[in-house]
């Protein structure tokens, strides 16, 4: 991904750095409208995810995470921007006339060919089961056979195949977690593109609001009814031994994963902080 630096003509563009990738014409049969976001509220209208709301209207692109066009070669026709994710997507024209979007693998260019199947070459962008050589870089990894890729889908994400034993493969995920997955599940070879997404600088607050992200307010400047850290005269301490969430739970060190999940035995090493 190429980063475009703005010329410092105004204060808002002084520190701006954005992706210079050109948008392409989206195929109408691969997009559909989606309802406006819930602004971080649940069905009862209670905020469950803070600092969300507003933003520009979006059309959802149908992404092929299953890669179930078996043994049919496809050609990359265009690389496009997707407002619903930080990774880019590419339009694939298959030999049987099918057209689909997939996540853009890093290094793939327009004109490259890809294919998915059980006996396909281990090449960037190809999708095949986890019966691959050790050390292979992977993304868009299935957890349940046939459900489609669920792991390592963000921009720049890459997992590594580190061991194989019996019917299971051991993967090291981008978070640092090491877990077992059935070697019949499929994955895509390579790394997700748009690696330099963290180098972008929006340059102004309005660009952040276009993305549907609202300002983040510190709990210490709120009222006691809104946050455990709130209240006091002037600049007051939080009044607690340890920081807390808006709901009163410990903010630091508390594990958020549910206990006794079915996949507990599949995780060999939990993610690194």
Curated annotation (Swiss-Prot):
Gene Ontology cellular component terms for the protein in this record: chloroplast; mitochondrial large ribosomal subunit
PROSITE patterns cross-referenced by the UniProt entry: RIBOSOMAL_L2
InterPro entries (UniProt xref): NA-bd_OB-fold, Rib_uL2_dom2, Ribosomal_uL2, Ribosomal_uL2_bac/org-type, Ribosomal_uL2_C, Ribosomal_uL2_CS, Ribosomal_uL2_dom3, Ribosomal_uL2_RNA-bd_dom
Source organism superkingdom: Eukaryota
Alphabetized SMART domains for the sequence: Ribosomal_L2, Ribosomal_L2_C
Assigned keywords, A-Z: Chloroplast, Plastid, Ribonucleoprotein, Ribosomal protein
Localization per Swiss-Prot or TrEMBL: Plastid, Chloroplast
Region (Disordered): 1-23, 223-273
Molecular function GO labels: rRNA binding; structural constituent of ribosome; transferase activity
Biological process annotations from GO: mitochondrial translation
Similarity annotation: Belongs to the universal ribosomal protein uL2 family.
Subunit-level organization: Part of the 50S ribosomal subunit.
Full protein name: Large ribosomal subunit protein uL2cz/uL2cy
Organism: Oenothera argillicola
Gene name, Swiss-Prot/TrEMBL: rpl2-A
């Amino acid at each position: 991904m190429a980063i475009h630096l703005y010329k410092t003509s105004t204060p808002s563009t002084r520190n701006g750095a954005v992706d210079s990738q050109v948008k392409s014409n989206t195929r109408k049969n691969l997009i559909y409208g989606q309802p406006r976001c819930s602004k971080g509220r649940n069905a009862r209208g209670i905020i469950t995810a803070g600092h969300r709301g507003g933003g520009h209207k979006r059309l959802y692109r149908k992404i092929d995470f299953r890669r179930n066009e078996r043994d049919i070669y496809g050609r990359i026709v265009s690389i496009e921007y997707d407002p619903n994710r930080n990774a880019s997507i590419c339009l694939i024209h298959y030999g049987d006339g099918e057209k689909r979007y997939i996540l853009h693998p890093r290094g793939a260019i327009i004109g490259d060919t890809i294919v998915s199947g059980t006996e396909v070459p281990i090449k960037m962008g190809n999708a095949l089961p986890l019966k691959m050589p050790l050390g292979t870089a992977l993304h868009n990894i299935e957890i349940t056979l046939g459900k489609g890729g669920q792991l390592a889908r963000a921009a720049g994400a890459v997992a590594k195949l580190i061991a194989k034993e019996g019917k299971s493969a051991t993967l090291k995920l981008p978070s640092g977690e090491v877990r077992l997955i059935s070697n019949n599940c499929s994955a895509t070879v390579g790394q997700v593109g748009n690696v330099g997404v963290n180098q972008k600088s929006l340059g102004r607050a309005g660009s952040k609001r276009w993305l549907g992200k609202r300002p983040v307010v510190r709990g210490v400047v709120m009222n006691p009814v809104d946050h455990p850290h709130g209240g006091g005269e002037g600049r007051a301490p939080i009044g607690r031994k340890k920081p807390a969430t808006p709901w009163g739970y410990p903010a630091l060190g508390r594990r958020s994963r549910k206990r006794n999940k079915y996949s507990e035995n599949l995780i060999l090493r939990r993610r690194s902080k």
